[in-house]
């Protein structure tokens, strides 16, 4: 199953908001590279939710529940519907990811402003070994 990561500013929309709402339309993605990730998502894919402000960290998981579609409010953007899955007991901080030096080529580390991306298999394996996934 493919994994993706989606960043959000918790002051705008947090994992707690998604938990309360149960589902949401994941929108606001504009960069071409991030849009490629949105367009690659399919129902059942897992999305790691990353808070980009405060302590930058992967804080929980959601699941894609729709096929990608054009954003009816923004002709240059695409959206997917996601459903809350769970909050992680222990967030995985960007600092921890960077300090491992195992993922220096991952977009999360290399392209700090990229909002949505795929998660490489080696990152998924590492998160599973930490009992996060």
Residue ranges and their predicted role:
Residues 50-56:
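Short, charged beta-turn/beta-strand-edge "cap" motif at the junction between a beta-strand
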Residues 1-11, 30, 69-133:
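Contiguous surface segments at macromolecular interaction interfaces
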Residues 48-49, 63:
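Hydrophobic beta-strand signal
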């Amino acid at each position: 199953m493919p994994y993706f990561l989606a960043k959000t500013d918790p002051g705008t929309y947090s994992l707690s908001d998604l938990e309360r709402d149960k589902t949401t339309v994941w929108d606001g993605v504009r960069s071409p590279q991030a849009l490629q990730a949105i367009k690659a998502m399919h129902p059942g894919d897992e999305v790691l939710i990353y808070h980009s402000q405060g302590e930058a960290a992967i804080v929980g998981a959601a699941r894609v529940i729709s096929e990608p579609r054009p954003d009816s409010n923004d002709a240059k953007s695409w959206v997917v519907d996601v459903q809350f899955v769970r909050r992680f007991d222990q967030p995985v901080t960007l600092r921890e990811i960077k300090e491992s030096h195992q993922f220096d080529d991952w977009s999360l580390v290399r392209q700090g402003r990229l909002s949505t991306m795929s998660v490489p298999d080696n990152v998924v394996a590492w998160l599973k070994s930490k009992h996060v996934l």
